[in-house]
From Swiss-Prot:
Gene: thrS
EC category name: ligase
Chain ranges of the TGS domain: 1-64
Cellular component GO terms, alphabetical: cytosol
Record lineage: Bacteria, Pseudomonadati, Pseudomonadota, Alphaproteobacteria, Hyphomicrobiales
Annotated compartments: Cytoplasm
A GO molecular-function descriptor: threonine-tRNA ligase activity
Organism of provenance: Rhizobium rhizogenes (strain K84 / ATCC BAA-868)
Cofactor section: Zn(2+)
PANTHER family to which the protein is assigned, alphabetical: THREONINE--TRNA LIGASE, CHLOROPLASTIC_MITOCHONDRIAL 2, THREONINE-TRNA LIGASE
Protein name: Threonine--tRNA ligase
């Protein structure tokens, strides 16, 4: 047995330590200050406790400033929360408490569920425990001991967890002072290293193991950060997100609603449907000349889905359709389509295709349905029925790179038109389980890697790029487009996916220049992804203050006095003739009341007309969110607003025509 271990440090230096030396020993050998700051170590990239003996490999000393420390801080905070709960409410059972995105939670079994009023009490107790600065220590228990100890404590959920751990796997128990829990670890050195930048966020119900047949538990969510400034910033973003919640704004703006009889499907109101159609019309114009817009059936025989493979691996997420009545002559099983690609392949296959016709680009604003658990549904962001701005390009292998670049240019241009300038494009490469031979993947990944470099180069570095190893679809590599909104949240929207699978499954081919049947390359492409979700993102990004060209109601003409009503109607008609969507408000109400009311529904422009404006044939323009009013002539107002209400793609075409004439 070796009497020493060899450790390689980030600077490349190599040191030897006695066998049994811990991470803390290594940190202390470098400096006392580093040992004081250290919270954990990483050996060959795997984070471990400071108290754990080190082994040969590459070592890193992790401090609270390290990004990896954040997960440890949150993990430890979850344990401290559990201890606080059991100190305050003895007899409460602790179940599972993982770190999640932006925080942590713990599920508790308690006779009476927790309420939001309990959270400040728990936080206060957590601060006491953190101040005690008790060390985290690890023990390895036998299965029998763990079951006996937890059973004696009345922790039946822990006993069940112990039973679920595979035979031969260590049962780790972490102590913080006298309190302990079953946990894989790792943890920091002591509770004091958590700090005070934490907050408990909310309580919710949760079934044990996520199964509705099991008992209902109470889940407490929390978050924690290394620094108070980071916590404050996160809470500020949450507050902003709440103000921008598209579900609330959708109600206030009278855009849409959901109801129990149609879970996960949208009831579009007049104004909401107008925005939706504005989005569709814009996307349709962007496809002109390059794409054939098609429409594949909503309901198809399951045999098609068996051929595509969806029936085997996606059936539980599909809505099956049965024929009404027992005496029908068609007893086949049908399903609502969860995606558009199999239908588009049928359209491509209808009739012989020559290489001279490629690329063939088929686009559809296709209504699809996918089963989502009711607990996962979230306004427009997560629904069961939605519209995909889907397209499938059938091309030759040689055309693949050019098509991917063409798609990229379109996607980035669309995002820019809606005000999204920070976009990240990432290439997802081959997963472990995949179809197609390595030569196909090598070729596709090589082409897409070059495309990725071109994307970054052409943008002058404005568009960030990256690689997601192993994250590709099983049928081919893909690009993922992630945009950043006004408050810094990231939304993955667009995708470009190369597919080796479906053309082969469906026997799609074209006739090449040698009169041979050749399988085409199929590229799946979506820009918005789900049109409903993209609209939800837009509403939240703009906090309901939609650009004039997107807004469902662009102008309200409001009069100060009934003497100006005639002129107000003339103003409204002139604006309508210029192509704007206009309503009038001639009610016998004070003008400030009218302005407040229309501001709640997020009308972008209110034109105020009084006796003076009628005499001068002028208007006062008041913008949403501004107290100021701008006076101008009616003709100036019409010219200015009609220009602003023109979609950006239409403006570009006009400018291009003018430049051509000039």
């Amino acid at each position: 047995m070796s009497q020493s271990v060899s450790l390689t440090f980030p600077d490349g230096s190599v040191r030897s330590y006695d066998a049994g030396a811990t991470g803390r020993d290594v940190a202390e050998s470098i400096s006392k200050s580093l040992a004081k700051k250290a919270v954990a170590i990483a050996i060959d990239g795997t984070v471990r406790d400071l108290s754990e003996p080190v082994a040969d490999g590459k070592i890193e000393i992790i401090t609270r400033n390290d990004d990896r420390a954040l997960e440890l801080i949150r993990h430890d905070a979850a344990h401290v929360m559990a201890e606080a709960v059991q100190e305050l409410w003895p007899g409460t059972q602790v179940t599972i408490g993982p770190v999640i995105e932006n925080g942590f939670y713990y599920d508790f079994a308690k006779n009476e569920p927790f309420t939001p009023d309990d959270l400040p009490v728990i936080e206060k107790k957590m601060r006491e425990i953190i101040q005690r600065n008790k060390p985290f220590t690890r023990q390895i228990w036998s299965r029998e001991k763990a079951k006996q100890v937890f059973a004696d404590k009345g922790e039946r959920y822990k006993v069940e967890l112990v039973d679920a751990i595979p035979e031969g796997q260590d049962l780790k128990i972490y102590y913080q002072g006298d309190w302990f829990d079953l946990c894989r670890g790792p943890h920091m050195a002591s509770t004091g290293q958590i700090g005070t930048a934490f907050k408990l966020m909310k309580v919710a119900g949760a079934y044990w193991r996520g199964d509705s047949n099991n008992p209902m538990l109470t889940r407490i969510y929390g978050t924690a950060f290394a620094e108070q400034a980071d916590l404050d910033n996160y809470l500020h973003i949450l507050a902003e997100a709440e103000k921008r919640d598209h579900r609330r704004l959708g109600r206030e703006m009278d855009l849409f609603h959901f109801q129990e009889e149609g879970p996960g499907v949208v009831f579009w109101h007049g104004k909401g449907w107008r925005i939706f159609q504005t989005l569709v019309s814009y996307m349709r114009r962007r496809l002109e000349g390059d794409y054939q817009e098609v429409n594949a059936p909503q309901v198809l025989d399951k045999s098609l889905w068996e051929t595509s493979g969806h029936w085997g691996w996606y059936r539980d997420n599909m809505f099956k359709v049965t024929v009404a009545g027992d005496d029908t002559d068609d007893d086949r099983v049908f399903a609502l389509k969860p995606m558009n690609c199999p239908g588009h392949i049928q359209i491509f296959k209808h009739g012989l295709k020559s290489y001279r016709e490629l690329p063939i680009r088929l686009a559809e604003f296709g209504n699809v349905h996918r089963y989502e658990p009711s607990g996962a549904l979230h306004g427009l962001m997560r629904v069961r029925g939605f519209t995909q701005d889907d397209a499938h390009i059938f091309c030759t292998d040689e055309q693949m790179a050019a098509e991917c670049l063409k798609i990229n240019d379109l996607i980035l241009s669309v995002y820019e038109d809606f005000g999204f300038e920070e976009v990240v494009v990432k290439l997802s490469t081959r997963p472990e389980k995949r179809v197609g031979d390595d030569a196909l993947w090598d070729r596709a990944e090589s082409v897409m890697m070059e495309v990725l470099k071109t994307i970054e180069a052409q943008s002058g570095g404005r568009i960030k790029t990256g690689i997601l190893p192993g994250e590709g679809a099983f049928y081919g590599p893909k690009f993922e487009y992630t945009l950043k909104d006004a408050i810094g949240r990231e939304w993955q929207c667009g995708t470009t996916q190369v597919d080796f699978n479906l053309p082969e499954r469906f026997g799609a081919f074209y006739i090449d220049q040698h009169s041979e049947k050749t399988q085409p390359v199929m590229i799946h492409r979506a820009i918005c992804g789900s049109m409903e979700r993209f609209l939800g993102i837009l509403i939240e990004n703009f906090a309901g203050h939609m650009p004039l060209w997107v807004s469902p109601l662009q102008v309200v003409v409001a009069t100060i006095t009934s003497e100006a009503d005639g002129y107000g109607e003339e103003v409204a008609e002139a604006l309508r003739d210029a192509g704007l969507t206009v309503e009038t408000d001639f009610r016998n109400e004070k003008i400030n009341y009218k302005i407040r009311e229309h501001s709640v529904t997020k009308v972008p422009v209110i034109i105020v007309c009084g006796k003076k404006e009628a005499e001068e044939r002028s208007v006062n323009i008041r913008r949403l969110g501004s107290q100021a009013q701008t006076a101008m002539s009616l003709d100036e107002a019409i010219a200015s607003l009609s220009l602003e209400a023109t979609p950006p793609d239409v403006l570009r075409k006009r400018e291009a025509k003018r430049a051509k004439v000039a």
